[in-house]
Amino acid sequence: MRIGSHNILLKVPALLYGWGVGVRNFLYDEGMLKGYKSSIPVICIGNVAVGGTGKTPHVERVIRMLRDEYRIAVLTRGYGRSGKGPAVVSVDDDASMVGDEPLQIKRKFPEVIVYVDGDRKRALQTLEQMPEELRPEVVVMDDGFQHRAVIPAYSIVLTAYDHPFTRDSFMPYGTLRDDPSSADRAESIIVTHTPDDCKPIDLRMMMGELPLKDYQDVYFSRPMYGAATPLFDTDQPGPAPTPESRISAVAGIADPEHFFDKVRELFPETEELIVYDDHHPYDEDDLEELRELIQDPDCFLITTEKDGMRLLSHADQLTPEERSRILYLPIEVSLSPKQERRFRERLHRAIKNNGLHL
């Protein structure tokens, strides 16, 4: 579900939005507004459009690359949370209070500090003041590319293969929240959701479409879905779904089509595709609707990892049998071995020099 709507009436507000973005970038480019450079190297992962590029799996990919050598903190806004002010996320937190994506990251990587704060500069200053033995050695800043109040050591811009920012327009006519030329500030561009059947000529054509600078690398990532996994821990696991099972797929994410395609590939008998808004907070009515879908012994509900974080807090409202029929598809992203090595080298160099001499 893309946010942009190509309604001609939205052209005027899109022009005004683009003008405002241009003024803001000009003020930073000319030094009239100042960014903050942290003493801790910051790896920024973001995009110039809203939603649908898979930022969280790429944050997790970077964590996997770095966690054996550095103490890591993830800094995120915690979009959609009801909690106010800064927060350190724990594995037992409620997604409604800290955000679904921060909770997902913390549950996967308990050793990583996950810090939620909309004020990125304040958050970095807080992390800098931690005792030396606990202070992170690198901060991965999620969805922070447009936040120029922070100067990263290394910036990564994500863009979807089937909807690159070069073919987009400013919000609300399109989905751009920053000028496409802002991508020049990034050291790397990752093209996400690259189809498995892409030929070398397709990749070269995409590289030709992107306005790459000499100092920029481009990478192509692919989603890797795992097997359907029970969402709730239970003493009495239920039967696993089979390709013949009757499946209802539920997604409250920015661009659910890739997820739905995978569910239909794994389970050809998928009957229902239910779409909610990104970060949708599940309520009693939603839960009742979902419960009705899994009353039959051969019915299962499969959702995304991110939705799963929001559903966990409703465990007490479900019977053990119902909990056993709710699963999620874990997702990671992969690069080719050659690109993975190159990307890792660039990250380590940026961390070592805190962004200098890239």
Give the ranges of each region predicted by the language model.
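A transmembrane-helix-recognition feature enriched in membrane-embedded lipid enzymes
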Residues: 1-40, 343, 350, 354
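ATP-dependent carboxylate-amine ligase
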Residues: 2-3, 68, 150-157, 161-358
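Residue-level signal for inorganic ion chemistry
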Residues: 16, 56, 105, 142, ...
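Walker A (P-loop) phosphate-binding motif
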Residues: 25-91, 196-197
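Residue-level preference for the first positions of well-ordered beta-strands
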Residues: 42-44, 71-73, 136-140, 246-248, ...
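Rossmann-fold NAD(P)-dependent oxidoreductase module
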Residues: 61-65, 142, 262
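Phosphate/Mg2+-binding loops and adjacent switch elements
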Residues: 78-214
